[in-house]
Amino acid sequence: MAQMYFYYSAMNAGKSTTLLQSSFNYQERGMTPVIFTAALDDRYGIGKVSSRIGLQAEAQLFKADTNLYQEIAALNEVEKRHCILVDECQFLSKEQVYQLTEVVDKLHIPVLCYGLRTDFLGELFEGSKYLLSWADKLVELKTICHCGRKANMVIRTDEHGKAIKEGDQVAIGGNDRYVSVCRQHYKEALGK
């Protein structure tokens, strides 16, 4: 029976690497997965999912107004899809997460979503909030803080490496803008 999975973590835990490995596993068995990624995240090129260790694959883009159920149903009509993989799923809307539940429940295709749980202020992203609520399986991927403890928070930094305490929830960046830390070092960095 198809299920929806939410693989979540702080930055640099290997979410994209895990997604790409899952895609490879399906392909190795003669199955056809489809990868989606957020159109607004073009750090590694448009329509690509890339990992820090150099793995890469082409991806379909989703925008704020993309109807994922319709897109996936249309793709599935052309060629049977065995798995849907969604990178940067924190950028999904509530409606898009619901559409993915419909993919699982009506099309009977497993959906594996990979993304951040919280932003640099410790607040849930909309997509993450509804994935935490509606996913069948929650899987935490782990990374470590500079102190060696599990990192479960993300700090956004300025050009001098200082923690930023306000700003837009979405600001695309990588290691140049974000640092994954444990809760204690998150609070210390923000002066809490």
From Swiss-Prot:
UniProtKB keywords: ATP-binding, Cytoplasm, DNA synthesis, Kinase, Metal-binding, Nucleotide-binding, Transferase, Zinc
Residues the entry annotates as binding ATP: S9, A10, M11, N12, A13, G14, K15, S16, D87, E88, C89, Q90
EC number: 2.7.1.21
UniProt subcellular location: Cytoplasm
One cellular component term from this protein's GO annotations in UniProt: cytosol
Active site: E88
GO terms assigned for molecular function: ATP binding; thymidine kinase activity; zinc ion binding
Catalysed transformations (reactions): thymidine + ATP = dTMP + ADP + H(+)
Claim: Cytoplasm is one of the keywords in the record: yes
GO biological process assignments: DNA biosynthetic process; thymidine metabolic process
Any Pfam family the entry gives: TK
Residues at which Zn(2+) binds: C145, C147, C182, H185
Main location as per UniProt: cytoplasm
Subunit field text: Homotetramer.
Entries under PANTHER family matching the protein: THYMIDINE KINASE (PTHR11441), THYMIDINE KINASE, CYTOSOLIC (PTHR11441:SF0)
NCBIfam families per record: PRK04296.1-5 (NF003300)
Family: Belongs to the thymidine kinase family.
Protein name: Thymidine kinase
Organism the protein comes from: Vibrio vulnificus (strain CMCP6)
